[in-house]
């Protein structure tokens, strides 16, 4: 091969690599800009343009499960502020009464309390059905749920067998049965909103939170599928995927990445009617978009390794804080 031919060949190879690099750069830039637009639109523009749900056109009552603390209580108060009467469903009657009085006094709406334990037998849904059957239901927030006390290996969870049964009942059965209770009412009215609280951990398998993240995947999949079944009937069913929120369950303090329940709900409600799946809080949206990209472009084994390493760090901090012996070193 002559020197001239070699130069041409090298030039062609360099040109191909340059164009491939440009193509990759343009594709990544497009994805970043699309995520930026998605976040900007769902956080700010949709609400300003009136593209969100018209809450005033829904039924008069909103049902919120797990409503005495955290995200559930914040949703109850936010919906009461919009004029909904509130059905508060949770385990402890005294706490329910306290929240009910607070809401009635602050927002001049009616409340109704139903004290049931979602980890018990399924006959609780007959009790709930009797309490809500005559109500004009506009909104259901499926917030009740339970998680690990700390990141842990599946077989080393304290009272693991009982916990696994309770976790499935609280996170999976409750969401399914409550949705099945209110959907016929909403279908008859031709309108309604169901908000199912899942988790950012539902985007990919999460080692050391394996059972919890698996239940939240169920909530996400159920929500997206049922939304598609009922969207033509005027019913909005949205999956809500929060990151870290400062609640009694998480035992985390507010920070840049850990928001208050009130802040989370404020942002999440701006996305109802705009997107089928929301991360709610702006920082959680950023985390969600990054995680989506990692899932799409990195091998699954690497994503699992990243998640495992992150949760292992959290687990070690907990063990150190409470002086526990870590046998998994």
Placement of each model-derived feature along the sequence:
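Rossmann-fold scaffold of SDR-type NAD(P)-dependent oxidoreductases
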Residues: 65, 115, 137-150, 171, ...
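Catalytic Tyr-X3-Lys loop
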Residues: 137, 146, 155-177, 187, ...
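Conserved glycine-rich Rossmann-like NAD(P)H-binding loop of the short-chain dehydrogenase/reductase
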Residues: 82-98
């Amino acid at each position: 091969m002559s020197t001239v031919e070699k130069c041409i060949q090298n030039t062609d190879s360099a040109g191909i690599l340059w164009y491939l690099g440009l193509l990759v750069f343009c594709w990544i830039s497009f994805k970043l800009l699309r995520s930026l637009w998605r976040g900007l639109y769902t956080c700010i523009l949709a609400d300003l343009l009136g593209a969100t749900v018209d809450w005033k056109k829904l039924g008069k009552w909103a049902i919120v499960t797990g409503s005495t603390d955290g995200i559930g209580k914040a949703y109850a108060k936010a919906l009461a502020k919009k004029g909904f009467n509130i059905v508060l469903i949770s385990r402890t009657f005294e706490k329910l009464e306290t929240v009910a009085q607070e809401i009635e006094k602050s927002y001049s709406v009616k409340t109704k309390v139903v004290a049931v334990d979602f980890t018990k037998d399924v006959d609780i849904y007959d009790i709930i059905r009797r309490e809500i059957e005559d109500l004009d239901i506009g909104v259901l927030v499926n917030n009740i749920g339970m998680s690990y006390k700390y990141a842990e290996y599946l077989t080393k969870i304290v009272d693991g067998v009982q916990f696994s049964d309770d976790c499935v009942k609280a996170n999976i059965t409750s969401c399914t049965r409550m949705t099945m209770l209110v959907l016929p009412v909403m279908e008859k009215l031709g309108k309604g909103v169901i908000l199912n609280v899942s988790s950012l951990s539902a985007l990919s398998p999460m080692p050391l939170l394996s059972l919890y993240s698996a239940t939240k995947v169920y909530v996400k999949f159920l929500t997206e599928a049922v939304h598609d079944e009922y969207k033509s009937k005027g019913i909005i069913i949205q999956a809500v995927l929060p990151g870290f929120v400062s609640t009694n369950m998480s035992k985390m303090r507010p920070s840049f990445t850990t928001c208050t329940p009130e802040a989370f709900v404020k942002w999440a409600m701006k996305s109802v009617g705009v997107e089928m799946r929301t991360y709610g809080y702006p920082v959680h949206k950023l985390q969600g978009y990054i995680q989506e990209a990692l899932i799409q472009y990195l091998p699954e084994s690497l994503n699992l390794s990243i998640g495992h390493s992150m949760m292992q760090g959290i687990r070690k901090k907990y063990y150190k804080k409470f002086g526990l012996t870590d046998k998994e070193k």
